[in-house]
Amino acid sequence: MPTETYSKLSQLHYHVDKHGKKKATKKINKALEGTDYSLEKLKRGVAVYRHKDGSSLVNVKGTDITNKKDILSDIKLGLGLSKHDKQFSSRRKQIKDHMKNEDANSVTLVGHSLGGSIVTSAMAKSKSIRDNVKSAEVFNTGYTKEFGKELSKGLKKEDKSLLKQKLIHNHTEGD
């Protein structure tokens, strides 16, 4: 799938902050008309899109600057303390729960900003996610030296190699 498609699907998820779940669902479904995707599940932090070929895309939404939990998560990641953050752990669990019902290598993970950091962390810290996800593509991921140290702790050479194969970081201007 093209990077542009992933970026658009990720951006649609932000409707949940602006409009609430019910109205956001309508707006997202309207935006998806005529595409190869449908919205399967929508939560504030995680959305699942289903492709017409049966594969799925799990998007982890980024920071809502009006949400204190998001700001706290950003601070913890900046300090290399994301392992103590409830949003990091709950969204990783949501990803794992979704993947339990999917064929291996049929799930793509996508995230923007804080969501990109959570996807990156999930890939680094969960062998089951790392081994079974098809790919992960993230946009303008929040990243610091301390977060990097936290993520690389305990990773073997082959884990790092697999991350390089499956995880693509995109940096866009004006975000």
Language model feature labels by segment:
Residues 111-115, 119:
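Gly/Ala-rich beta-loop-alpha elbow adjacent to hydrolase catalytic centers
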Residues 5-110, 127-135, 142-153, 161, ...:
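A conserved cap/lid and substrate-binding interface adjacent to the catalytic center
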Residues 119-128:
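Short glycine-enriched nucleophile-adjacent loop
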Residues 172-175:
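Acidic catalytic loop of the alpha/beta-hydrolase fold
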